[in-house]
């Protein structure tokens, strides 16, 4: 479970990094690309968070 929580944290940090890169990018294509990557990472993080919650509920 600790591994999953660590991965969740990494995903969220990477999403924040991509959002920062998107804001600082000078080219429109790069802004869109990094914004899209950030969105995808947040979606994956949400799925992982739900999986962690489901596993925690099963343990209890």
Can you name each region flagged by the protein language model?
Residues 1-60:
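Long, non-catalytic architectural segments outside compact domain cores
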């Amino acid at each position: 479970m600790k591994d999953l929580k660590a991965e969740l944290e990494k995903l969220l940090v990477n999403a924040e990094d991509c959002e920062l890169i998107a804001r600082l990018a000078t080219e429109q294509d790069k802004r869109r690309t990094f914004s899209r990557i950030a969105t995808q990472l947040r979606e994956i993080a949400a799925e992982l968070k739900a999986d962690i919650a489901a596993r925690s509920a099963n343990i209890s």
